[in-house]
Structures are given as structure tokens and as C-alpha cells.
């Protein structure tokens, strides 16, 4: 089922949508023991054993300053992503890159954000004085005319899990050559519904056998990538901004030194040095997600939204809000969900969950079955 609680409009000033006031993985707010955490989009499972040992061996490195701009990780990431080193900026998670983009292009005066959306896009634009144009994800077509300026688009989207078809996205990009697009690919490893834009950011003259026919197509596109989600390290904050060198240079002018800590750099070097073990094919995860969605629909009769990833939205009945459901689940069952009420374009009745192990999925299914029958 598609997202329908969306709107287009204009916004100035502060709202209650600030992400720092509500986000996933907020178990620290509760004294109750957590049996299962569905609130974060991070891939379920333990920290990679090899990475754990590596970080333990490198912990003494924190007695020294990190590289001012994480140069070693920048070079390794560039090779992994198939671009030149000066096309990459290492950031303290994707969140830092979002705020840097809003600062670097604040002179454009206006930003477009597709809704529903990760609230950090709004927070960053508001901080740097950009007027915001809201564009409904559902009403976006290849021929939609955006007002230009800075455009934030999450591909696949958070919190809906929906992805724009590649042809749709490319037509949109080519139709707005004067806008600066920030394409957040934080969850690209978790979908088969779209492909990364990175091959289109390669320099045409790069002597690589796999350079795409349209390499260098988009001098106005900044792609954001993350190691947080697929590598299960949200506490270390490792992100990347990737684009043509002119875009990266503008971002770098706004970036403070030493924003990426020593252990984060070490983790990134280890991850890129150990290849695809950190990026398993998504087929099994997506199949588990689809099966669990059907179980939830059958158990609750609630609205469970379609997704192209391993996370998705659910809408509660009007008898209780997602916030009330969240409190009930954590206090009665030790289960944590993501109240999605602070995502612009959603309602107080939306919550988001991410697929976990089959055992944990069953725990939430049964708890929600009980709520659907007896209330809170």
C-alpha cells in the first residue's frame, strides 16, 4: 500500500519535527530491558567479529589526534566507490554531510525536500536560513518541475522504504541542471528496486574498465553514502559525500577539522579492506521482510505499507497513537518501535519498524496482534 498522507507546501520557521527530539534506537530513554529493537534501520545482528578485534587492537590510537580530514579513508573509499580521491569527503556520519550541504549552498535561498523525509534535511536547511518547498513523494513524476535551489532526496526513502525507479530519477536530474541535488543513498545496499548513481559520477577520463557510458553526467549531484547501516556501527559515525571535485571543494570549505575520530577511520579502513562480507546480497533480507509484512497484515488488519527495503511503515487505528503504542510495547513487552510522527508528511498514527530475526519478528507480531484485539 502506498503512502498517502503527504502534502506540498511552503515553510518558514521552527516546528516540532526536529529530529533530535525523536529518532530511532532510543533505548537509552527507558529503564526497561530491551528484548528486541525494531526502531533502527541498521541491519540486525552482532558487530562483525573481525572488526571488533581490529578496533580492540587499535584503541590505543585514541591517544593521538586523527587525520584532520581522514585522508587515508578518503583514498580507500574513493577506490571502493570507483571515483577519484578529490571526489570524496569523509564525514561524521551522513548527518554531517547533510548539514555541510545546507551550509555550502545556503546562497541558493531555497531547498526542496521530498516528503515524508528524514527530518535532518529540514533541520539543516532551517539552521542555514533556506526557505523550504515541500514536494510529495507520491505526486512526483519524471516531469515534475521543482523550484531549483538545493534538492534533498533519499533513495530509497526513509521512512517509507520506497525507491524511485532509476529512469524516473535520471529524467528528474536531467530536467533540473541548475539545481544541486543531494541524493542520500544510505540504504542503497538494502534494495533491488534501484541502482546507485555512483557510476554516473566517475570522471570520463578515468582509466577503469567499468566506467559507465554516462560517466560524469551529473556535475550537480552529490551522493551520500554510509557505513552505519549495513556494517552495524551507528555509534562510530562514518559517512561520505561523493560528487564532482568542485562540489566536494565547496563542502570542504565548510567542514571543521578532526570531525571523524580515530576509531571511525580505523573501522572504515578495515571494512573497505574486507570486501563484500559487509555487504551481503539483499535477497534473503527482502524475502524475510515481505513474509513478515504479510504476517503483520493478517495478525492486525492494520495498514502495512509496501516497501522496497527491509524497513516499512505501519499505521495504527485511530483508537491510539503510535506514541502510545510505543510506550505500551516497551513497558509491557520490552519491544522498541520507531514513532514516525515527527517525519513531516506522516501522522501521529504512523510507526516504522525494520525486519529483525524471525524470532524477534514473531515477538512483535504477537504483541501487535494482542493490541489490535484488546487495545492498549
Per-segment meaning from a language model:
Residues 48-50, 69, 220-298, 302-305:
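PLP-dependent aminotransferase class I/II
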Residues 66, 70-110, 128:
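Phosphate-binding glycine-rich loop
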Residues 104-126, 131, 138-144:
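Conserved PLP-anchoring active-site segment centered on the Schiff-base-forming lysine
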Residues 196-228, 246-250, 351:
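Conserved active-site segment immediately N-terminal to the catalytic lysine
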Residues 2-64, 354:
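N-terminal "arm"/small-domain region of PLP-dependent enzymes with the aminotransferase-like
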Residues 286, 299-333, 355:
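Conserved PLP-binding catalytic core of the aspartate aminotransferase-like
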Residues 133-193:
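Active-site phosphate-binding strand-loop segment of PLP-dependent enzymes
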Residues 167, 331-332, 342-376:
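PLP-dependent enzyme catalytic core of the Aspartate aminotransferase-like
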Amino acid at each position: 500500500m502506498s503512502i498517502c498522507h503527504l502534502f506540498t507546501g511552503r515553510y518558514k520557521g521552527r516546528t516540532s519535527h526536529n529530529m533530535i527530539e525523536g529518532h530511532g534506537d532510543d533505548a537509552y530513554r527507558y529503564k526497561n530491558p530491551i528484548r528486541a529493537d525494531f526502531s533502527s534501520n541498521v541491519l540486525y545482528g552482532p558487530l562483525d567479529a573481525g572488526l571488533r578485534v581490529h578496533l580492540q587492537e587499535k584503541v590505543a590510537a585514541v591517544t593521538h589526534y586523527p587525520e584532520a580530514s581522514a585522508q587515508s579513508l578518503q583514498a580507500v573509499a574513493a577506490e571502493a566507490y570507483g571515483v577519484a580521491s578529490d571526489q570524496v569527503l569523509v564525514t561524521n556520519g551522513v548527518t554531517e554531510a547533510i548539514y555541510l550541504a545546507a551550509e555550502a549552498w545556503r546562497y541558493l535561498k531555497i531547498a526542496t525536500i521530498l516528503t515524508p523525509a528524514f527530518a535532518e534535511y529540514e533541520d539543516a536547511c532551517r539552521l542555514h536560513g533556506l526557505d523550504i518547498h515541500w514536494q510529495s513523494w507520491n505526486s512526483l513524476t519524471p516531469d515534475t518541475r521543482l523550484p531549483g535551489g538545493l534538492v534533498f532526496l533519499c533513495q530509497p526513502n526513509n521512512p517509507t522504504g520506497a525507491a524511485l525507479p532509476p529512469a524516473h530519477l535520471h529524467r528528474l536530474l536531467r530536467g533540473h541542471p541548475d539545481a544541486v541535488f543531494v541524493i542520500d543513498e544510505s540504504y542503497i545496499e538494502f534494495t533491488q528496486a534501484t541502482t546507485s548513481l555512483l557510476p554516473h559520477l566517475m570522471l570520463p577520463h578515468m582509466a577503469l574498465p567499468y566506467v559507465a557510458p554516462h560517466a560524469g553526467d551529473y556535475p550537480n549531484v552529490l551522493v551520500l553514502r554510509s557505513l552505519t547501516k549495513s556494517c552495524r556501527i551507528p555509534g562510530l559515525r562514518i559517512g561520505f559525500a561523493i560528487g564532482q571535485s568542485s562540489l566536494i571543494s565547496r563542502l570542504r570549505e565548510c567542514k571543521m577539522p578532526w570531525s571523524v575520530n580515530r576509531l571511525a577511520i580505523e573501522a572504515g579502513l578495515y571494512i573497505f579492506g574486507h570486501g563484500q562480507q559487509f555487504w551481503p546480497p539483499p535477497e534473503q533480507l527482502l524475502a524475510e521482510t515481505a513474509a513478515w509484512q504479510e504476517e503483520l497484515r493478517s495478525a492486525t488488519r492494520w495498514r502495512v505499507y509496501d516497501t522496497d527495503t527491509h524497513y516499512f511503515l505501519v499505521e495504527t487505528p485511530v483508537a491510539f497513537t503510535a506514541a502510545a503504542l510505543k510506550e505500551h510495547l516497551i513497558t509491557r513487552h520490552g519491544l522498541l518501535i520507531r514513532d514516525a510522527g515527527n517525519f513531516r508528511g506522516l501522522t501521529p498514527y504512523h510507526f516504522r519498524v525494520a525486519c529483525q530475526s524471525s524470532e524477534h519478528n514473531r515477538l512483535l507480531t504477537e504483541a501487535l496482534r494482542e493490541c489490535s484485539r484488546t487495545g492498549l
